[in-house]
C-alpha cells in the first residue's frame, strides 16, 4: 500500500467532523518526551488550534507527564512552553513502551478517553529490546483490534518506524526495522475499513537523525515539527481534516 503522501486509506474519502474530534497520542519515548522538551504533541496541538480551532477538537488520554531522566520515571511537568494548556498535554505514551505494552491497554484507554482518532508512533523500542519484526507486527494488529473493540469507528494514523542511530552500525537491526515497516504497511492494507479507516503516514519529509534529534533517536525541535507534520499531512491529504502542516521547521 502506498503511503498517504500519494493515496488515501479509502480513496477520496473525506472524514466528517461536525462534532469535536477527540485525539489520543500513543507512543514511546519519542512521544512522551523528557523534561524540558516541547514534544511533537505540543507541535500538533498548535496545528490543531490553527486548523480546527477552539471547540473543533479535544486532546485526550490518561497521562500528562514528561519523562524525568534523573528520576527514571514519568514525573515531570516541565514542558518547553510552560503555557502549554494542561488539557492539551494528555497522552498515552511511555518511555520504553511499545506495541507490546500498548496493545493490552489501548481498549481501556480509548473507552475512558472517548477517543475517536489515534495518532500512533510505536515500534522502535519493540524491535530494539522486545520482539522481532513478525511479532511486533502481530502486536500492532492486536492493538488495532483492541482499539476497535472499544470504539468500532475509531480512526488511526500510524507512523512507520524511523530507524535510529543504532541502525547505522547494526545491520540486522536495520533490516528488522525495514521488514517491520513492510509488515506494518500490509497490516494497514489488510485492516483499513470504511467505518474505521487506518492510515500509514509517510516517513517525515527530510527527517535526519543527525540534525533532527538530540541523541540519534529522540526528536529535537526540528524533529518534533517534522513528526507532527507527518501526522497532520496524512489526515489532511486522506481525510480532509485540518490543513497542510505549516509549523516552522526551525528551532523553537
Region locations from a protein language model:
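Sec-exported extracytoplasmic/periplasmic mature domains
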Residues: 31, 45, 49-53, 111, ...
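Active-site segments of SGNH/GDSL-like serine hydrolases
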Residues: 119-128, 144-179, 202-207
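Active-site cleft segment of glycoside hydrolase catalytic domains centered on the general acid/base Glu
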Residues: 128-143, 168-180, 213-222
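Substrate-gating cap/lid alpha-helix
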Residues: 163-202, 221-225
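Histidine-centered active-site loop/cap adjacent to the catalytic His
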Residues: 23-26, 212-252
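Stable alpha-helical elements in mature extracytoplasmic
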Residues: 36, 40, 102, 106, ...
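Short hydrophobic segments within beta-strands
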Residues: 26-27, 159
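Conserved SGNH/GDSL esterase-like catalytic core that processes O-acyl groups on lipids
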Residues: 24, 30-138
Amino acid at each position: 500500500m502506498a503511503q498517504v503522501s500519494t493515496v488515501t486509506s479509502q480513496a477520496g474519502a473525506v472524514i466528517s467532523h461536525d462534532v469535536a474530534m477527540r485525539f489520543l497520542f500513543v507512543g514511546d519515548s519519542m512521544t512522551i518526551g523528557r523534561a524540558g522538551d516541547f514534544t511533537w504533541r505540543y507541535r500538533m496541538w498548535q496545528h490543531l488550534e490553527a486548523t480546527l480551532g477552539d471547540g473543533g477538537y479535544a486532546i485526550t488520554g490518561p497521562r500528562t507527564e514528561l519523562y524525568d531522566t534523573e528520576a527514571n520515571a514519568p514525573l515531570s511537568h516541565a514542558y518547553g512552553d510552560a503555557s502549554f494548556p494542561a488539557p492539551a498535554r494528555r497522552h498515552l505514551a511511555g518511555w520504553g513502551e511499545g506495541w507490546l505494552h500498548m496493545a493490552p491497554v489501548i481498549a481501556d484507554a480509548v473507552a475512558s478517553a472517548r477517543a475517536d482518532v489515534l495518532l500512533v508512533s510505536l515500534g522502535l523500542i519493540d524491535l530494539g529490546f522486545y520482539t522481532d519484526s513478525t511479532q511486533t507486527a502481530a502486536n500492532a494488529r492486536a492493538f488495532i483490534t483492541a482499539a476497535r473493540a472499544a470504539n468500532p469507528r475509531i480512526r488511526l494514523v500510524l507512523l512507520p518506524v524511523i530507524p535510529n542511530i543504532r541502525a547505522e552500525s547494526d545491520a540486522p537491526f536495520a533490516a528488522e526495522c525495514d521488514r517491520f515497516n513492510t509488515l506494518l504497511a500490509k497490516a494497514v492494507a489488510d485492516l483499513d475499513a470504511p467505518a474505521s479507516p487506518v492510515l500509514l503516514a509517510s516517513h517525515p519529509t527530510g527527517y535526519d537523525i543527525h540534525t533532527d534529534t538530540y541523541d540519534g533517536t529522540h526528536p529535537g525541535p526540528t524533529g518534533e515539527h517534522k513528526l507532527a507534520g507527518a501526522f497532520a499531512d496524512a489526515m489532511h491529504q486522506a481525510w480532509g481534516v485540518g490543513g497542510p502542516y505549516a509549523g516552522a521547521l526551525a528551532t523553537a
